[in-house]
Amino acid sequence: ALGEGRFAADDFLREIQGLSAHFDVLRIDGVDYRHRGVPKAPPALTDAQVAARVAATPGATLDDFDAVCEHLARVHPSKYARLVEGVPLVGLTGVHQLTSQDVALRLVVLVDRLYDNDVPVAASGESLGAIFTPEMLKGGYRKKYFRSLSRLAALAEMANS
């Protein structure tokens, strides 16, 4: 389980229960704006559309999604910024839902670097909005995954404009 072995859970629980004895719980009704959802990713492009966008953008890259994921496994995440440095557009073909959390988390770091550098992403295959499994979106890294989905939607919109 997430966090297992990192701290003394029994001690933590005892301290939290001790603190909670000094507080009252108040229910506040209304819209919870933290759960507004993720911006919807634009529809996936065709391989030909991605290739055309890459061809029209000098210095752009065109790669197969699985090949990118395999490459990320061989590069330390601290070096991902170098991978996208100076790249005006990333074209990805064959995008599909990821089932491995390791691969998904590496992709999250890459998306962060793309977003930090304002590198648009043109993608074919499945929608970028479906890249993470429902289980991933409910798990311990859900905030990272939702941030990544939001950023992917923004980068895909940039590629479409």
Give short role names for the model-derived ranges.
Residues 55-116:
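Conserved helicase/translocase motor-coupling segment
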Residues 89-161:
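Terminal-proximal interaction/regulatory segments of ATP-powered molecular machines
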Residues 20-24, 86-88, 117-119:
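Short glycine-/polar-rich loops that comprise or flank the Walker A/P-loop
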Residues 1, 29-32, 61-64, 93, ...:
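Short, solvent-exposed coil/turn linker segments
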Residues 45-59, 66-69, 119, 126, ...:
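Conserved P-loop
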Residues 5-54, 147-161:
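Conserved P-loop NTPase catalytic core
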Residues 2-7, 136-139:
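Short, flexible/disordered intra-domain loops and linkers
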